Amino acid sequence: MLSRKKTKNEVSKPAEVQGKYVKKETSPLLRNLMPSFIRHGPTIPRRTDICLPDSSPNAFSTSGDVVSRNQSFLRTPIQRTPHEIMRRESNRLSAPSYLARSLADVPREYGSSQSFVTEVSFAVENGDSGSRYYYSDNFFDGQRKRPLGDRAHEDYRYYEYNHDLFQRMPQNQGRHASGIGRVAATSLGNLTNHGSEDLPLPPGWSVDWTMRGRKYYIDHNTNTTHWSHPLEREGLPPGWERVESSEFGTYYVDHTNKKAQYRHPCAPSVPRYDQPPPVTYQPQQTERNQSLLVPANPYHTAEIPDWLQVYARAPVKYDHILKWELFQLADLDTYQGMLKLLFMKELEQIVKMYEAYRQALLTELENRKQRQQWYAQQHGKNF
């Protein structure tokens, strides 16, 4: 090969100085703030990397072919300060009961859903700090490789065992937090915390869980979510008390107003669209003898000014003469009531005039009929 001539810039460069590469340690505070998948890579291996455990007695012996661990998801031990170790130990002791705290708490026949779990993180919600727990390397090294043909039988045994395990678990342990890689064949609705399950949910409410296993309540009436049960003791207004009686059942007492009721004071009133029962109509006879006390109209006895009577009879073209802005609001209300009284009196006079005219017409018709009958009788006597 032909050698390339060095340029003037390359000739003028100084000789490189070889140094030692030192890896920078990450601060413990920043390590806790970084997500786990950034620090350690993916935590869920592929199916070809980890095989299911054997059901034989020698399944967990360390001799024989050992599973080759995937270095992409198994973290290496990190040198920590004594303060960091004490803080993690305190977090581990304060962890909830449904998280596995040691390798002895993990069932060996639980299947592959926990065989590759290297990190279990507690839910970090509402500002609570999360704790992480790691299983020892012997847990991975003690699993033997199995042929691919036997995995179908192991999968069936896994789901069958999970079904029996979920049925034997007590109901007060809460929802299991693992669920990584596979979903159990049993509904997780039976693994809820029954501390507030004794209270029935109001109409339009339902229960659900977050991705980290925390229980919350959904109000479909207002499309809102709540962490606490809608009918819990903490949800009562001030001055209310929930009483559980063997004789009367559960009821709520309002110590402020000295009353009791069965309905929760904060329960939403949802209208029900049930068919109402048929009601037979029974007309009630109104008693006409009762004297109804009606307040008298103050304008009937008030003296109407002369100018207001002139204004009521005057045509509209003279309205600009009165300056209404000089009147007070109370006076205008009084004059408006007086004008209504004048119009009612005028209407009453008009009605009386038409009624007198109608009575005169009826009287004239009656007189003419009587005259015709009298003439007919006289004409019959003559013949």
UniProtKB/Swiss-Prot annotation:
- Name one matching Pfam family: WW
Q: Which positions carry Phosphothreonine?
A: 210
Annotated Gene Ontology cellular components are: cytoplasm; cytosol; nucleus
Q: Where in the cell is it found?
A: Nucleus; Cytoplasm
> What would changing residue 358 to A do, according to UniProt?
Loss of interaction with STK3
Query: Which residues does the UniProt record annotate as the domain SARAH?
Result: 321-368
UniProt modified residues of type Phosphoserine? 94, 136
Q: In which tissues is it expressed?
A: Ubiquitously expressed in adult tissues with highest expression in the pancreas, aorta and interventricular septum and lowest expression in skeletal muscle. Expression was higher in fetal than in the adult heart. Expressed in various cell lines.
PTM notes: Phosphorylated by STK3/MST2 and STK4/MST1. Phosphorylation is not required for SAV1 stability and may increase the number of protein binding sites on the scaffold molecule.
Chief localization: nucleus
GO MF, one example? identical protein binding
Tell me the ranges covered by the WW domain, including all copies: 199-232, 234-267
- Source organism, top-level taxon: Eukaryota
Instruction: Point out the coiled-coil segments of this chain.
Output: 344-373
* Annotated PANTHER family: PROTEIN SALVADOR HOMOLOG 1, SALVADOR FAMILY WW DOMAIN-CONTAINING PROTEIN 1
Q: Subunit details for this protein?
A: Homodimer. Stabilized through interaction with STK3/MST2 or STK4/MST1. Interacts (via SARAH domain) with isoform 1 of NEK2. Interacts with ESR1 only in the presence of STK3/MST2. Interacts with WTIP and AJUBA.
Function of the molecule: Regulator of STK3/MST2 and STK4/MST1 in the Hippo signaling pathway which plays a pivotal role in organ size control and tumor suppression by restricting proliferation and promoting apoptosis. The core of this pathway is composed of a kinase cascade wherein STK3/MST2 and STK4/MST1, in complex with its regulatory protein SAV1, phosphorylates and activates LATS1/2 in complex with its regulatory protein MOB1, which in turn phosphorylates and inactivates YAP1 oncoprotein and WWTR1/TAZ.
Q: What is this protein called?
A: Protein salvador homolog 1
Q: Taxonomic lineage of this organism?
A: Eukaryota, Metazoa, Chordata, Craniata, Vertebrata
- Gene symbol? SAV1
